[in-house]
Amino acid sequence: MIWLGLSIAIFLGALYFSPPQIFTKPPLSLLALAAIIFLAIAWNVSPTLPGQAPGKFYGLIFHFYGASLLTAMFGPAIALAILFPVAFLGVYVIQGGYAEASQHYLMVCVLPTFFSYLTIKAIHRFIPKHLFVLILGNGYVAAFVSVILTGTLLLILKLLFGDASNHIDFEGWLLGLI
């Protein structure tokens, strides 16, 4: 229940800090709705390479990149507001359970959004303003850094608080992030 409360609090805070035009003006509202539907579908696709065992979270990188891309496009508040229905549509409706959807939102939506926003702010502060820097820095570098930092943090949390009987494939985990 604490997961759900924290998720709802973050979502309501994101809605409060989001400009209302994103959800009321027709071109932007359609883009937000399309992002919600597309990400909810894309997050339920789990691509695997030949020879990979299914269920190893190799498709999890789409979740991280989706959150990072929304942060670069709209900013963190709008990204978190869009990702909340995505997490609950994509996880709760398909797999069921408020706890799973809330944990998914917090770990796979909020963390990459946070790291991506911090990376974008650092790029804006320390690197000169240029179109190439905008595209490469905000798009690729922020996404890459947020994926690596989020994946590493989740791996550390899994090692600290996870079940000790489960074997963790470190190479598979880190290669799955890249």
Residue ranges with predicted function:
Residues 5-12, 68-77, 110-120, 178:
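Hydrophobic cores of alpha-helical transmembrane segments in multi-pass inner/ER membrane proteins
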Residues 47-55, 87-116:
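Interfacial aromatic-anchored transmembrane helix boundaries in multi-pass membrane proteins
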Residues 123-178:
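Membrane-embedded alpha-helical hairpins and interfacial helices in multi-pass inner-membrane proteins
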Residues 1-6, 104-109, 143, 172-178:
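Alpha-helical transmembrane segments of polytopic membrane proteins
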Residues 24-35, 59, 66, 79-85, ...:
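Cytoplasmic-side transmembrane-helix entry/capping segments in multi-pass membrane proteins
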Residues 41-46, 70, 85, 89, ...:
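Alpha-helical membrane-inserting segments
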Residues 1-70:
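Hydrophobic transmembrane alpha-helices
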Residues 32-41, 68-73, 109-114, 138-151:
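Small-residue-rich segments of transmembrane alpha-helices in multi-pass membrane proteins
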